[in-house]
Amino acid sequence: MSGYNYIFSNIKNANQISQGKKAVSSLGVKAVGKYKLVVQLENPEPTFIDKMVMPAFYPQNTRLVKKYGAKYGTAAKYTAFDGTFKVTKWTNTSEKWTAVKNPYYYAKSAVKLQKLNYQVVKDSNTAHQLFQQGSLDDAVVSGTTAQGLQNNKNLYHLYRSGNNFVNLNMAKGAVLANKQLRQALYLAVNRTQLSKKVLADGSKPSYTFSAPNAAKDPASGKDFATAAQPKETYNVAKAKKLWQAGLKQLSKSKLDLTLVASDTTTDKNVSEFLQSQLESKLPGLKVTVKNLPPKSAYNLAANGKFDLYLSFWINDYADPYSELQTLEMTNSHNYGKYTSAAYNNELSQARKNAATRSVYFSHLLKAQEQMNQDYPVLPLYTMVEDHLVNANLKGVLWHKVGIVDYTRAYFK
């Protein structure tokens, strides 16, 4: 969970403890009796309760943690469960496992399912076949399989509050520290073509780092991502001029950029599309694509060994801040080393004024608008999950933020 340290930052003394400047005992958290937790915050934060459903905040059974030591959490028998279901037949290498109804769950009478069988299916075509055979009641499909099923009566589009985008390496000395080159890249990508022709799975073009379906801007009543969208999103002629001006500033006539992405079918297709789009529209540009296993691609990004990095983010809670904070200067997810005092200041002001919703969102909007001027990332398309769902399966909560919830699910 080290990559999520920042979500604790508003808890009293959390930052100082993380930096080794204060003792853990000074953390602004304490248990009052068996059923009450008191948390002291540095600043007001209306969405803090929403954050508490994230796994990073889950309580741990101290007795079991000490008992199992390094084995804790590596298999079902070394893990404690206090939710609707408890997991059985699982190890950290399992591709199949079962969740059975928890007899100690406080609202067990409202839970109709006795168990859920999970199966890892790496190929969408296989997932489709298993669904047709009746072996799966909820099957996630993507790529060409999803494209061919867009008119299927069992297909459900789950539009997540998430975006797929390209991180641009802006570190000191990197060629993309040049703003004109970054703006040229942004304006050269035909996102409509990407979503409709390449992905063709229900995805929609994305023009801001802030993902849709997180929250509405109280001033305009619009989805925050729509309210924050820049006016100009695609202009090839302008992109060429900016590109040539940027090259001139760097005393270059051509440029080689490396695009790092995972080796999933979707990321391969998106990588090829970006390579073609950028090379054909920006004179003197060569894009070398490196499709690697996700962990290997991430390691390169985390160590700054990329020019372009195809990535994504799903909001952890229903607030644009969830995503925007990942590009603050000190955030561990800021792989491209975006550095903007104005951007950071707006987020800081948002935190200080979080108790007043209108003021809070006005600062978030200004932060996104600042990013629109700086081009630290290339937003590409919104995140959609295509699910084949048993027509008799009811009561599932399809959350745009968070995980799919089967707590009250049942079969008709």
What residue spans do the PLM features occupy?
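Alpha-helical secondary-structure segments
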Residues: 34-38, 114-115, 163-209, 255-265, ...
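Structural transition elements
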Residues: 204-245, 266-268
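Gly/Pro-rich hinge or "lid" segments in bacterial periplasmic/extracellular proteins
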Residues: 12-16, 22-24, 41-111, 115, ...
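Ligand-site clamp/hinge motif
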Residues: 101-149
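Aromatic- and charge-enriched surface segment that lines or borders ligand/interaction sites
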Residues: 1-10, 38, 175-177
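Ligand/substrate-recognition segments at binding pockets and active sites
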Residues: 92-94, 236, 244-315, 330, ...
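Extracytoplasmic/peripheral linker and loop segments enriched in polar/acidic and small residues
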Residues: 21-25, 231, 284-297, 324-390, ...
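Long beta-strand-rich cores associated with HINT superfamily self-processing modules
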Residues: 387-412
